Amino acid sequence: MKFQYKEDHPFEYRKKEGEKIRKKYPDRVPVIVEKAPKARVPDLDKRKYLVPSDLTVGQFYFLIRKRIHLRPEDALFFFVNNTIPPTSATMGQLYEDNREEDYFLYVAYSDESVYGK
């Protein structure tokens, strides 16, 4: 997926910012969250998040669901590198395994469980 954040900010800027954030907040991880193309869910009011490393993916789902005002019966799926992460994983684990060279973790969200549909 093409992330708008990457389009808006050159790599060097993102990397410098990511390094600065990691130094200043070593117990938190910088995450970029954007809606997947063709997803039929609302847009987020912001796309950059600084989340505690020990927050689980499941807890992060809850936060994002709240921000986009999803009803309990509405589906929401996260994709990290085109894969749905386990809800029991911590954001810190997910970050360590999937962060990009600019020190950000990129997460796409959708109402479909198949990426890009």
UniProtKB/Swiss-Prot annotation:
Q: Where is this chain's protein located in or outside the cell?
A: Cytoplasmic vesicle, Autophagosome; Cytoplasmic vesicle membrane; Cytoplasm, Cytoskeleton; Endoplasmic reticulum
On whether RNA-binding is a keyword of this UniProt record, the answer is no
Which Gene Ontology BP terms does the record give? Answer: autophagy
What domain of life does the UniProt record list for this protein's source?
Answer: Eukaryota
Q: How does it sit in the membrane?
A: Lipid-anchor
Alphabetized, the UniProt keywords read: Autophagy, Cytoplasm, Cytoplasmic vesicle, Cytoskeleton, Endoplasmic reticulum, Golgi apparatus, Lipoprotein, Membrane, Microtubule
Which cysteines pair up through disulfides? They are: none
Query: Pro-region residues?
Result: 117
Lipidation (Phosphatidylserine amidated glycine) at which residues?
116
By sequence similarity, the record places it as follows: Belongs to the ATG8 family.
Outline what the protein does: Ubiquitin-like modifier that increases cell-surface expression of kappa-type opioid receptor through facilitating anterograde intracellular trafficking of the receptor. Involved in formation of autophagosomal vacuoles. While LC3s are involved in elongation of the phagophore membrane, the GABARAP/GATE-16 subfamily is essential for a later stage in autophagosome maturation.
What's the name of the protein? Gamma-aminobutyric acid receptor-associated protein-like 1
Question: In the record, what lineage is assigned to the organism producing the protein?
Answer: Eukaryota, Metazoa, Chordata, Craniata, Vertebrata
